[in-house]
Amino acid sequence: MIEQLFPEVTCYALRYLDYSSLCQLSMTSSSMRKTANDDVLWRALYFQEFTEETNGGTPVNGWKAFFAVTKQVMTVNDKFFSILDSRSLPRMTSLWLNSDYVKCFNGSGELFTGYLLTYPLL
């Protein structure tokens, strides 16, 4: 039924969905996948969820990928600061013992990975 609406109306209605609901809706049919993957929709969701400014351009891989990367980075940062705030020695020990692998994302959403030891030994 919603597929029979004009694409602009459907896209406007979908702006009220959150991240997980939008992802679930995109798996219901091919027309919903096309509508739910609209770049304008993901741009609006990005600015609704995050108040950070971008560099003013369009992300290389689109707003959906940029949203997913930003959400993942925010989740990891929240977990990190939660562990530090808890001042729990076991949680901090686990963090430091398992933190040798690093993932970084630049502004365009490009992923860089590597191990913490990226400089020559002295």
UniProtKB/Swiss-Prot annotation:
TM annotation in the entry: none
Ranges where the F-box domain occurs: 1-45
One Pfam family hit: F-box-like
Name of the featured protein: Probable F-box protein At4g23960
Classification of source organism: Eukaryota, Viridiplantae, Streptophyta, Embryophyta, Tracheophyta
